[in-house]
């Protein structure tokens, strides 16, 4: 592969790049509500949502990782939050295909590879790009983000 192709791929992977800026703009909240039904085994969302196997996701966008009140997070999630992980559309988009790999890479990139151990409680992976955009649009309906 040519050097410039690597540079383009690397730039596209950066949070805040045009590729990630399109995340919330390309999602359909109504379709995201349908996708979210897969998440309801572990999560709830809405004004009366309670923690289950996973934390309630009301207000997740803009929240520091590992800080939903009353939820017992994994050490990996808490470490990511303590080292600056605040959930945004872009970061959730990157997280959903492989939560463990994302958190470990986040901590390693922050210079904390010694904290990138263990695993998150989230075993589910959502790889489909459009479904991720849709579910993020749905999450935004329950966010204070303006």
Task: Tell where the protein language model's regions lie, with residue ranges.
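Bacterial N-terminal signal peptides that target proteins for export
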Residues: 1-7
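Extracytoplasmic electron-transfer domains, predominantly the class I c-type cytochrome c fold
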Residues: 29-30, 34, 51-122, 135, ...
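Short cysteine clusters
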Residues: 39-42
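Thiol-/selenol-based redox modules, centered on thioredoxin-like
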Residues: 131-146
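Electrostatic cytochrome c docking/interface patches
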Residues: 16-36, 47-48, 146
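Cleavable N-terminal signal peptides
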Residues: 8-9, 19
């Amino acid at each position: 592969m040519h050097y410039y192709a690597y540079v383009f791929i690397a730039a596209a992977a950066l949070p805040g790049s045009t590729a990630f800026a399109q995340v919330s703009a390309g999602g359909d909240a109504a379709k995201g509500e349908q996708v979210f039904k897969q998440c309801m085994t572990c999560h709830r969302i809405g004004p009366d949502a309670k923690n289950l196997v996973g934390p309630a996701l009301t207000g997740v966008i803009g929240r520091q990782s590992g800080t939903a009140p009353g939820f017992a997070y994994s050490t990996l999630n808490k470490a990511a939050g303590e080292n600056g992980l605040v959930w945004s559309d872009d970061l959730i988009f990157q997280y959903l295909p492989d939560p463990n790999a994302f958190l470990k890479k986040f901590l390693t990139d922050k210079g904390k590879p010694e904290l990138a151990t263990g695993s998150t409680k989230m075993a589910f992976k959502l790889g489909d790009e459009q479904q991720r955009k849709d579910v993020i649009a749905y999450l935004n309906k329950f966010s204070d983000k303006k």
